[in-house]
Amino acid sequence: MSRYLFSSESVTEGHPDKICDQISDTILDALLTQDPRSRVAAEVVVNTGMVVVTGEITTTANVNFTKLVRDKIREIGYTEADNGFSADSCAVFLALDEQSPEIAQGVSCALEVRTSEEDALDRIGAGDQGLMFGFACTETPELMPLPISVAHRLTRRLAQVRKDGTLAYLKPDGKAQVTVEYERKDGVDRPGRIDTILISTQHAAVIDDLSDNDAVQARIKADLQTHVIGPVFADLDIRPDAQTRLLVNPSGRFVIGGPQGDSGLTGRKIIVDTYGGYARHGGGAFSGKDPTKVDRSAAYAARYVAKNIVAAELADRCEVQVAYAIGVARPVSIFVETFGTGRVSDEALMLLVREHFDLRPAAILRDFDLCRLPAQRGGRFYQDVAAYGHLGRPDLDLPWEHTDKAATLKQAIQTAAAV
């Protein structure tokens, strides 16, 4: 038996890059709520005292972009001007254009339509070329890798204890990283123990009557053990042990944070958004993009495929790649890999995927109702996945997390085996 370490990180909603992702998806939610046909590519930059919203938007919706920006910043928790960034005092600059008519043509009128080789679902072409990956494994109940699952739990808990006043001295910016020791036996990898927990969290310079930084850091570490780490691991089978390293603010001090400490940009946390580096990534970001962009919708669909394969007990680990050409509806390739954990061959699974999953953009939009979900969910949907992961979210009802095809896949394999 061999052992190895694997690490994944997460960031809080107050991290500068995540502020941008959430603003981008708040704009997307508002536009799709009014006009489900909106074409959106909203990019955001934040820095000390400043927000820039740019990109390409084509819509009939009428929204107050500046108000959307300020409301989201306030919800995240940046309300004090002395942080160098606050909802009411930051400047908001808008620089928005319409979607390129050449790109719009390829999306609205796919190659299959232009060559008269189509059915109704061929009408929408992919918004760009690219490759997307989906993944699932049996390490957690939500079928996600353990390191990223625990890292997200930690950052969500950091935000919770800040907002509910349990640890009122915490500020919005923060990060967590979890290192898991895996055991490999007979070619099978299983998480064995938690090797390292790293938390960096922004905090007030003075906590109660403590002003000495060493005392402040000791208080933070003790509080995080009690109010964050303990509750996060309470319902997990794998927990920190006597040898687990706990690192809290190892840089020594974290008072200056958020956009005052670092600029932020939409789309810079794509590994945090997905599988924490445990699976491959095609490179395309999600936030700020309407669902006709396959960077987003096809990555969700690939996760759906992989999760249903694992839920059907056809594999313990499954990765699905799908690739597209701009303006073409049908994927140019589909690939399935189970890393030696499959109950049937990867080739058989690829045939199963082609038979039971329609991965054309219009079919993905239809099956998940991606353009109408914001209106159906009271005006907010995408902004809720813009922090703490787009995948493996038991706290949210996400259509790509459903395992409604697992029974069908299992039956199809059993039927084929009986022939």
Curated annotation (Swiss-Prot):
Residues at which L-methionine binds: E56, Q99, D262, K293
Cofactors required: Mg(2+); K(+)
Primary site of residence: cytoplasm
The entry's keywords: ATP-binding, Cytoplasm, Magnesium, Metal-binding, Nucleotide-binding, One-carbon metabolism, Potassium, Transferase
E.C. code: 2.5.1.6
Protein location: Cytoplasm
InterPro entries linked to this entry: ADOMET_SYNTHASE_CS, S-AdoMet_synt_C, S-AdoMet_synt_central, S-AdoMet_synt_N, S-AdoMet_synthetase, S-AdoMet_synthetase_sfam
Positions with a binding annotation for ATP: H15, D173, G174, K175, R253, F254, D262, R268, K269, A285, K289
Subunit structure: Homotetramer; dimer of dimers.
Function summary: Catalyzes the formation of S-adenosylmethionine (AdoMet) from methionine and ATP. The overall synthetic reaction is composed of two sequential steps, AdoMet formation and the subsequent tripolyphosphate hydrolysis which occurs prior to release of AdoMet from the enzyme.
Family, as annotated: Belongs to the AdoMet synthase family.
Protein name (Swiss-Prot/TrEMBL): S-adenosylmethionine synthase
Species assigned in the record: Gloeobacter violaceus (strain ATCC 29082 / PCC 7421)
